């Protein structure tokens, strides 16, 4: 399904290895090259949507990220889309608040104290100008949207995994952005 890209230790490495092996044997793996290229583009798509929403005025905005690991049920952040998002947000002058049920320690190891490490998903949303769903953990599927909306400075939700229903979220008073729709 549409999303903000894949990561992890196996699939990205395997795709690169297949491309390289084919090249060494005189072949071009155009489909795999396209897969790799599109995956890298997808990792920036939420950032681009955020820029468009705020007319590129992101300096000093507070952005919350739900999910840091490359997939749910792990703390593995290898090639995770969250790393690219965090770097882009910090480089443009955003304040970043993050929460992941398992990958907080790994995130701190990778990026240090340049972000705020929230105690839970509600703490991450506190005073946020926008909330980005990056990893589709089960606990993010049914939050108390009233609590989230009240906690946020502006109720803007960027759904990087298309787990929410646009109509439902918008009826709750959020501006909703998703992938591919």
Regions found by a protein language model. Name each.
Residues 1-181:
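Structural/interface elements that position substrates and couple domains in central-metabolism enzymes
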């Amino acid at each position: 399904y549409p999303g903000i890209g894949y990561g992890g230790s196996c699939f990205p490495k395997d795709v690169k290895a297949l491309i390289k092996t084919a090249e060494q044997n005189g072949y071009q793996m155009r489909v795999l090259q396209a897969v790799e290229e599109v995956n890298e583009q997808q990792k920036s798509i939420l950032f681009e949507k955020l820029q468009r929403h705020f007319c590129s005025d992101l300096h000093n905005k507070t952005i919350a990220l739900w999910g840091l690991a490359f997939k749910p049920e792990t703390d593995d952040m290898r090639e995770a889309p969250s790393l690219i998002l965090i770097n882009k947000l910090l480089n443009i002058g955003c304040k970043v608040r993050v929460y992941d049920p398992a990958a907080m320690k790994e995130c701190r190891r990778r990026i240090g104290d340049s972000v705020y490490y929230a105690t839970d998903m509600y703490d991450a949303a506190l005073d946020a100008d926008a909330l980005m769903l990056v990893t589709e953990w089960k606990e993010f599927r049914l939050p108390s949207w009233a609590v989230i909306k009240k906690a946020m400075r502006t109720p803007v939700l960027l759904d990087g995994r298309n787990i929410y229903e646009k109509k439902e979220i918008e009826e709750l008073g959020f501006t909703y952005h998703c992938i591919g729709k």
